[in-house]
């Protein structure tokens, strides 16, 4: 059985790069009837944040990335890690190192002066004497002294590391007894039954150390897939300076989870020339072996395009529900479905839709200055006043279109002579959906009120 996991540290918000990693792991497990597990790597007790843990869970819930079983918290497993430290010490595969901080700094300085790679010099590897007083030891693994470590990566292919270039007897437990990152990861992945590890390629350098630990502990090494980073449009690693990176910020900005997941799955993976992928499509086609080796580029315009696609195509009930968070209750409006369906054709985000909806639902408190200067004058005011006089009952969009065409014909006018001024009267702006749909939503009495308000306006 395929078992994957997502293992964030709750020291900050969930980055969209992290969500992409979670998505890839989720898809691979679900497509193969496997398990997708969530582990919170909260061993850094000083930097952990309960808010960050909650944000991770909220992001998963929003994107509907359900995980199997209970969440695993590393902070609740310290006794377990200590057992495995003791096991390695008892088997002679790890040892206590009593080097002081000053000695380590002196060693590093001398190695750097000789232009050597800074690394531990193994002085306590086979130590049998009396340990120095007053020093709490760290625990180090006995790493191989020579040879190669080979990773058969599902994305990058065969990756070889020379032991002399990258390894030393690295620390697995600090002097206060807390375990190190690589040690806890290996134990948890093994005990949780993880078969496939899909993660960012910033973890590639950790992998040789983890393989050393898998072998020392007698655990089976999982299959690794190291995914290249997401870059900003300037070619540099994606960060806050490129815009929002917090997953829940995208929700606040009016993006749909379907659009964000579709966007992220394509940042590093493709299936032919297809651009639109529902979760069902992803489950059908996704394979981690097809992930690109090279970095992908964040494209804000592509995300907007995808979001507008899902706004156009998702069911009315779903969009109406999501719009409640943006202060618009379409279901409470007499013509709510008509209004939403009209606005969805021209909205890139739910915030845009909310702003457009509020401009139609509520009488304008002010008018766009450029639109006013361009379209409002004594002539257009006279046309609006005449138009208001013929509004004696509510109609549907087709009825308002017929009424308007008759009015224009009788007065020797064209639609452009009325439409923009009428839009400004109704919404405060010269931009709106179909003017006839706006008329239907607003209704004749309110249309007359808004025209009167504009006519009273002094500019």
Curated annotation (Swiss-Prot):
A motif ('HIGH' region) lies at residues 8-18. Its main location: cytoplasm. A motif ('KMSKS' region) lies at residues 237-241. ATP binds at residue 240. GO terms for cellular component: cytosol. One of its GO terms (molecular function) is tRNA binding. Its EC number is 6.1.1.17. Keywords: Aminoacyl-tRNA synthetase, ATP-binding, Cytoplasm, Ligase, Nucleotide-binding, Protein biosynthesis. It catalyses: tRNA(Glu) + L-glutamate + ATP = L-glutamyl-tRNA(Glu) + AMP + diphosphate. It holds the Pfam family tRNA-synt_1c. It is an enzyme of class 6 (ligase). It is found in: Cytoplasm. GO terms for biological process: glutamyl-tRNA aminoacylation. InterPro entries: aa-tRNA-synth_I_cd-bd, aa-tRNA-synth_I_codon-bd_sub2, aa-tRNA-synth_I_CS, aa_tRNA-synth_I_cd-bd_sf, Glu-tRNA-ligase_bac/mito, Glu/Gln-tRNA-synth, Glu/Gln-tRNA-synth_Ib_cat-dom, GluQ/Sye. Monomer. Belongs to the class-I aminoacyl-tRNA synthetase family. Glutamate--tRNA ligase type 1 subfamily. Catalyzes the attachment of glutamate to tRNA(Glu) in a two-step reaction: glutamate is first activated by ATP to form Glu-AMP and then transferred to the acceptor end of tRNA(Glu). This is Glutamate--tRNA ligase 2.
